[in-house]
UniProtKB/Swiss-Prot annotation:
GO terms for biological process: heme biosynthetic process. Keywords: Cytoplasm, Heme biosynthesis, Iron, Lyase, Metal-binding, Porphyrin biosynthesis. GO terms for cellular component: cytoplasm. Coiled coil: none annotated. It comes from Vibrio vulnificus (strain YJ016). Pathway: Porphyrin-containing compound metabolism; protoheme biosynthesis; protoheme from protoporphyrin-IX: step 1/1. This is Ferrochelatase.
Length: 319
C-alpha cells in the first residue's frame, strides 16, 4: 500500500475588501464583525448596533481610507499575500494556496484548490506570529467550518504561532537594520501590535505575552537597551479598555520625553495593510510630528522579503 502523501500549504490571513468602495467594505466588515471571536457581545445586543450604527457610519469612512493605500493590483494585503504564495511555492516546490478568514478567497476555496491538485496533507500557516483567539483562533474556526464541506478530510498540520521563532526574530531584526542603514537610526524603536480588548487577555488570551516576548527577543537580537525599545497596541475601537499602552497616545507623548527621532515597526502584521500603511505610516507620522517629533521612520512589514519566505518555509518543513 502506498502511504506517500502529497503535501500542500494553506496561507491564512484576515482578509480584505475586494474593492475600495463603501459597499465592498460594508460586506467585509459585516462578516468580520459578526465573528464572536472578534466581538463577543450577545448577538441580540450587538447585531442591531452593528447593522444600525457601525456599518452605515464606518463603511464609507473606511472605504476612503482604503483608497489612500490601494495599489494598482488591488488591496495591499492581497497583493503581498499573492507574492508570498508565489515565492513560497517556488521555494518549497509544492502547492501553496491562500485562504482568508473573511472575504475571498475563503479558507474553503484554498482547501478545494489544494485538493484539486491532489494534495491530501495540508500544512495550515495562519500568518499571525503572536497567537490570539481573535485571529489564529478565528482562522482555526474557519478551517473547521471549511472541512465540514469537503468529502474527504485531508491530514492537517496547524501552526499555532511563531512569535519566538529564531528566523522570525532575525527577519524582523534584518528589516530594522536595513531601515537604519538606509534612513539612519532613531532615538527609539516602537513595536506597535494590533490591540485586543483588555478583557480578552484577562480571560486568558495569551496574545500580550507573545507580543512582549517578540519585542524582548528583537531587543536582544538588535543589542538595544530596554530604554530604546517599547511595545504598544493600536487599532482599538469602541469604548471598552484595550491592551495598553496605546500606540496613538504613545506617539503623542514621546517627543515631550526627549524622543525626537522614531523608528516604528509592526511585528504582528505579516503583510502591509490598511492598519500599517494608513494608521501607522500616515496617521502615526502626523501625530508624532505634530507633537514635536522631528523624524519618523515607518519600517514596512516583512511582506515577501527573502528572509520572511525562508522563515515560512522553515515553519512548514519543521513539521
Amino acid at each position: 500500500m502506498n502511504n506517500t502523501k502529497k503535501r500542500g500549504v494553506l496561507l491564512v490571513n484576515l482578509g480584505t475588501p475586494e474593492e475600495a468602495t463603501a459597499p465592498a467594505v460594508k460586506r467585509f466588515l459585516s462578516q468580520f464583525l459578526h465573528d464572536q471571536r472578534v466581538v463577543d457581545m450577545t448577538r441580540w445586543l450587538w447585531c442591531p448596533i452593528l447593522h444600525g450604527i457601525i456599518l452605515p457610519i464606518r463603511s464609507p469612512k473606511v472605504a476612503k481610507l482604503y483608497q489612500t493605500v490601494w495599489m494598482k493590483e488591488g488591496s495591499p494585503l492581497m497583493v503581498y499575500s499573492k507574492r508570498q504564495q508565489v515565492e513560497l511555492q517556488a521555494k518549497l516546490n509544492c502547492p501553496v494556496e491562500i485562504g482568508m478568514t473573511y472575504g475571498t478567497p475563503s479558507v474553503l476555496d484554498g482547501v478545494n484548490k489544494l485538493q484539486a491538485q491532489g494534495v491530501d496533507e495540508i500544512c495550515v500557516l495562519p500568518l499571525y506570529p503572536q497567537y490570539s483567539g481573535t485571529t489564529t483562533g478565528a482562522a482555526y474556526d474557519a478551517l473547521a467550518h471549511a472541512l465540514r464541506k469537503v468529502a474527504v478530510v485531508p491530514s492537517i498540520q496547524f501552526i499555532r504561532d511563531y512569535h519566538d521563532h529564531p528566523l522570525y526574530i532575525k527577519a524582523l531584526a534584518e528589516s530594522v537594520r536595513q531601515s537604519w542603514q538606509a534612513q539612519g537610526k532613531g532615538d527609539y524603536l516602537l513595536c506597535s501590535y494590533h490591540g485586543i480588548p483588555q478583557r480578552y487577555a484577562d480571560n486568558g488570551d495569551i496574545y500580550p505575552l507573545h507580543c512582549e516576548m517578540t519585542t524582548e527577543l528583537l531587543r536582544l537580537e538588535l543589542g538595544l537597551d530596554k530604554s530604546q525599545i517599547g511595545t504598544t497596541y493600536q487599532s482599538r475601537f469602541g469604548r471598552e479598555e484595550w491592551l495598553q499602552p496605546y500606540t496613538d497616545k504613545t506617539l503623542e507623548s514621546l517627543p515631550a520625553k526627549g524622543i525626537k527621532s522614531l523608528d516604528v515597526i509592526t511585528p504582528a502584521f505579516s503583510v502591509d495593510c490598511l492598519e500599517t500603511l494608513e494608521e501607522i505610516s500616515e496617521q502615526g507620522q502626523e501625530s508624532f510630528l505634530h507633537a514635536g517629533g522631528e523624524q519618523y521612520r515607518f519600517i514596512p512589514c516583512l511582506n515577501d522579503a527573502p528572509s520572511h519566505i525562508e522563515m515560512m518555509a522553515r515553519l512548514v518543513t519543521e513539521r
